[in-house]
Amino acid sequence: MFGMKSRKKSATLLLTAVMSLSLFGCSTGNTTTGNAAQPAGEGNAAAAAESKAKAAGGKLVLYSAGPQKLADNIVNEFTAKTGIEVEMFQGTTGKILARMEAEKANPVADVVILASLPSAQALKADGLTLPYPEAANADKLNKDWSDAEGNYFSSSASALGIVYNSKLVTTPPKSWADLATSAWKDAVNIPDPTLSGSALDFITGYLSANGEKGWDLLNAYKANGVAMAGANQEALDPVITGAKSIVAAGVDYMAYSAKARGEPLDIVYPEEGTVISPRPAAILKSSSNVENAKAFIDYLLSDEAQKLVTDAYLIPGREDIEATNRANVKDIPQLKVDWAWMSEHGVEIAARFSEIFK
């Protein structure tokens, strides 16, 4: 099921799965049963989710890329509304794909939520997704982030920026190129694109916009002591503590959330543009709880769930909703990226990047 059909067809999925397997094996996650109080709730999408779930009964198995608190809140509210027990594995996109690869002979998940659009595109290309074009509120989603045929739905997104320690950095850099200057020698981390779906989105997106010359910047980063430092949280933690000053391609919701908790962090979106990384959810064709999976997608796109998304400092996937606690899409300069190209070239780019930064 997950065999290498072609480099173009499932490149990102297989690269991330195989490399993550080598590092993590079959790591275990959290099993969560929603038990929150029944929310008031409004909206046709939530009603549709409740109706479908009551008709189906049973459970749902969800594999979800972070943030953990958001995933827990969505699961708890969905369970409170529908009575459906949700078993959740929570991890990075790489860990989720590795787990799916390990389970390919006996698939377990009903729904996956990933932090990388090309990974969802690869799932669709491999015929592993179950289309659900009639999902409630799907017509309100950002069309560039979701599948027109209903194979995946980006219910949220994050942008990649320059995240810095505001105690150490008084004049933050304004462009990606600034991080290759002597002012930031040995002071910068960057997440590992084989462990972070959003980091892979940034690197492939930057190269899709800048072509082969984009590698000049990445090579300059290496020469300036930029360190490839694990997944997103592992790259960010040394900046919070002051061991490093900056994360290049830092995930913005982590910065906003940490800043709200009182950590000395802030973020800059470089003037030449960045990548906004959608977070797609998909029903798997192998699901044994299809009606529950559809109900979950309906809930994920509901007003209630989108409020939970904005509370977690993420960009809502629906275009009719804006966050009030962070920058919205219109506020963020964006690179002109080609998602199809990014998906096609993910393997070679991640391998080349890892070779440079190893």
What are these regions (language model features)?
Residues 43-85, 258-259:
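Short, polar/charged alpha-helical segment
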Residues 275, 284-337:
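Mature extracytoplasmic/periplasmic domains
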